[in-house]
Amino acid sequence: MRAFSLIIRLGTRHLPWLGGLYQAQRLSRSRSLCQAQGFSRLALSLALLSLVALNLVALPAQAEIRVVDDHGEALTLAAPAKRIVALAPHLVEDAFAAGAGAQLVGVIAGSDYPAAARELPRVGSYRGIALEAVVSAQPDLVLAWGSGTPDDLVRQLQALGIPVYRSEPRRLADIAGNLRDIGLLSGHPAAGERAAARFERALLESRQQLTPAPRVFYQLGQAPLTTLAGGQIVTRVIQHCGGEPLFADAPVLVPEIGWEALLLARPQVIVAAAKDDAWQAFWAGHEALPAVASGTLYSLDPDAVSRPGPRLAQAARQMCADLADAAARLASSSPSEGQGQ
């Protein structure tokens, strides 16, 4: 009898139509017609059990979620992640854009966009990330930055059975891929797809070709003077906007540039990630450089251009507008420079 009641309770909870059968079975006990037909409690219980089993077998199993991260590693989740730790500001932005902001339980210092990210618990900073802080957040998914998250930390998390997705976008298209992947992993594939499509559409609208392509120096540091070499997302943005990024073939990612090399490169445009134009005072008195002589120095939103996330489309739009302006000014001020000589 207990087994029969348990079957009915389980059945009516998960399969509503069993409730009706159960009521019918109860009524049958008081009717002689059922007795005449020879239905016993055991027979009905077995029938109900068979129906439950058949329906449970028929229920579709939830499909595994499988993606390949930017390091070429396959990541498989049995179910969408519910507790996510993001170890880079751009990954926090990705998560919010892909609909997973509410599932973030830990982020890295400097994660300030959108505004809701400022209220999330910190598990570390660019100076270091404590394994204990990440683990204590009880994540079922960690979003790591390929070149920014220590490899040792990634291996330790994986050894503990915590899935790690590593983001390392080197091309603009990789950012859209990250948005789609995070949407899938967090159970928001539609939101991830929408975010990726918005990003791709914005890039398509801003893309331009300039003939000749202006020579662009991206100033990263001032003392010493440094830039970013090829393979960095900023150089991709410059190319996307029709410019020629100088020193893109340097053998290191952050090359130090001497004055002689810069004079030989003759940059026609200088851009830097800065909140204002104060950095441009550094170039006063260097009119031997075409960019300084023509005044084609531009400031870019530092967060938008340095974080390979959804707001990079905004930085690309700004960069493209600046390079188009520079090309027009160069063409009108100096025919030789306008021709890229």
Predicted region positions:
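Extracytoplasmic substrate-binding proteins
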Residues: 64-67, 73-74, 140-141, 145, ...
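Short helix-initiation/N-cap motifs at beta->coil->alpha
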Residues: 70-72, 123-132, 148, 250-259
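Alpha-helical, coiled-coil/dimerization segments enriched in small aliphatic residues
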Residues: 110-113, 227-253
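Short helices/loops that flank or line small-molecule/ion binding pockets
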Residues: 131-138, 160, 256-266
